[in-house]
From Swiss-Prot:
Cellular component terms (Gene Ontology): cytoplasm; ribonucleoprotein complex; ribosome
GO biological process assignments: translation
Protein's UniProt name: Large ribosomal subunit protein bL21
One Pfam family per UniProt: Ribosomal_L21p
Domain of life the protein comes from: Bacteria
Ribosomal protein as UniProt keyword: yes
Function, as annotated: This protein binds to 23S rRNA in the presence of protein L20.
Family: Belongs to the bacterial ribosomal protein bL21 family.
Organism: Ruegeria sp. (strain TM1040)
InterPro entries: bL21-like (IPR028909), bL21-like_sf (IPR036164), DNA_repair_Rad51/TF_NusA_a-hlx (IPR010995), Ribosomal_bL21 (IPR001787)
Keywords: Ribonucleoprotein, Ribosomal protein, RNA-binding, rRNA-binding
């Protein structure tokens, strides 16, 4: 039984017991990872995905984090410009050993999904948006409605503790002089009074 999996923008045909060098994964040596992007499973009853085979996965054990062979990039400018530059690059790779090919039941396996080092989990991306939406729903006003207040100035006003039009409308000249984070213009106070009323 073999499988064709996709990782790091490349496709690999693998069997149980194969050693494979793939683009760097976010896993330490000895961990077991699971490749969920399986394009095909071959054997007695081959299954081809569209584009992936649902429920299929390939599990592998991380052997070590390695670097590939050095690639030399040489730049030479010909004719009158006698300059040249040499740069070497060693790609970061992960050496894995294929342990098992699952034709189904990959969701319930409980093994960590193989992700690249630079990728972030989708749940981690959604969390900051939820935190950013929470202060807006907590009774604060959209301060960018004031003339001359953009997103950066609104953040400075919030940092100074001014989140509503009523708070800005209630500021006296002494209060305005005491705020160092941002210079509050008198017309903002007038506009805030109008917006606070309705």
């Amino acid at each position: 039984m073999f499988a064709v999996l996709k990782t790091g923008g490349k496709q690999y045909k693998v069997q149980a017991g194969d050693m494979l060098r793939v683009e760097k994964l976010a896993a330490d040596a000895g961990e077991t990872v699971q490749f969920n992007d399986v394009l095909m499973i071959g054997g007695d009853a081959p299954v081809v995905g569209a584009p992936f085979v649902s429920g299929a996965a390939v599990q592998a054990e991380v052997v070590e984090q390695i670097k590939g062979d050095k690639v030399i990039k040489f730049v030479k400018r010909r004719r009158k410009h006698s300059s040249k530059r040499t740069v070497g690059h060693r790609q970061k790779l992960t050496l894995v050993k294929i342990t098992e090919i699952l034709a189904s039941g990959a969701d319930a396996s409980g093994v960590k999904a193989a992700t690249g080092k630079g990728e972030a989990a989708p749940a981690a991306k959604a969390a900051p948006k939820a935190k950013a939406a929470a202060p807006a729903a907590a009774g604060s006003d959209d301060l960018t409605q004031l003339t001359g207040v953009g997103p950066a100035a609104a953040k400075k006003l919030e940092a100074a503790g001014l989140t509503t039009f009523a708070q800005i409308a209630a500021l006296s000249e002494d209060d305005i002089a005491g705020i160092d984070a941002i210079k509050i213009k008198p017309e903002w106070v007038e506009q805030a009074k109008e917006l606070a009323q309705g």
